[in-house]
Amino acid sequence: RISSYQFDPPIDSSDMEPAFWAKLVEIINYNYNSFDGFVILHGTDTMAYTASALSFMLENLSKPVILTGSQLPIGTLRTDGKENLITAIEIAAAKNPDGTAIVPEVCIFFENHLMRGNRTTKINAENFNAFRSFNYPPLARVGIHIKYEPNLIRKPDLSKPLKPHYLFDTNVVILTLFPGIQEGIVSALLHVPGLLSLIHI
C-alpha cells in the first residue's frame, strides 16, 4: 500500500526552514506504525540540509526515510526523477528475511547511489550525479540489482520507540574564517541580538 501527502501549497526547496522539518517529522511520526518506510520528494538545493536535520530529529529510527528528487523536472522527456522515485520507493519497502528494514535510517537516493543523509553534500547543479558522500561510502549502489552494504548501514535498537524532536533553535550562526577576514565582520556576528551559539568551521 502506498499513500501520499503533499504540502499545500508546495514548498520550493530554497524556502525550506526548520518549521517545515518539524512538519515532516510530525507526518512521519503520525504514520510511523502504518507504513514500512517513507519517501520524501525534495528539491535538490536544500535536500542535504533536510536529510541531515531529519537524521537527528528522528531519534531511534528503525524504518527507512529516503529523500530523492531530480535534476530535470519530472515532466521532461529525459528526467531522472522517475527512476529516482521508483528506486527510492523500492528501497523504502525493502526488508530483511526477519522482516526488519534493510536500510533503517535517513538517506538520500540519487543517480544510482544511496547515501547516508547526514554525510551527503550537493556538488553539482549540471549533472545527474548531483550528490556525494565524501567521508562515508554509499550504503547501496544500484544497477540491474540493488547492492546493499550491510556493514555500513546503521543498526537500530528495535527495543526503543521512535522519539521525534520538533524544536530547533535558530539563534545559531556558522562562521568560516579565511585569510583577510575583517575583524568588524566577526564582531558584528558575535553581537547579533539573541545569538546563542557560534560554530567555527
What positions do the PLM features span?
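Accessory alpha-helical/coil subdomains and C-terminal extensions
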Residues: 1, 116-195
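ATP/NTP phosphate-donor binding region
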Residues: 1-29
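Structural motif
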Residues: 36-37, 194-196
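Proline-centered loop/turn at the N-terminus of a beta-strand
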Residues: 37, 62-66, 105
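Structural recognition of the beta-strand scaffold that forms the well-ordered cores
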Residues: 40, 66-67, 197
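Short Gly/Thr/Asp-enriched flexible loops that form oxyanion-binding sites at enzyme active sites
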Residues: 40-63
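Internal gly/pro-rich beta-alpha loop/helix module
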Residues: 67-144
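Conserved small/polar residues in nucleotide/adenosyl-binding loops
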Residues: 199-201
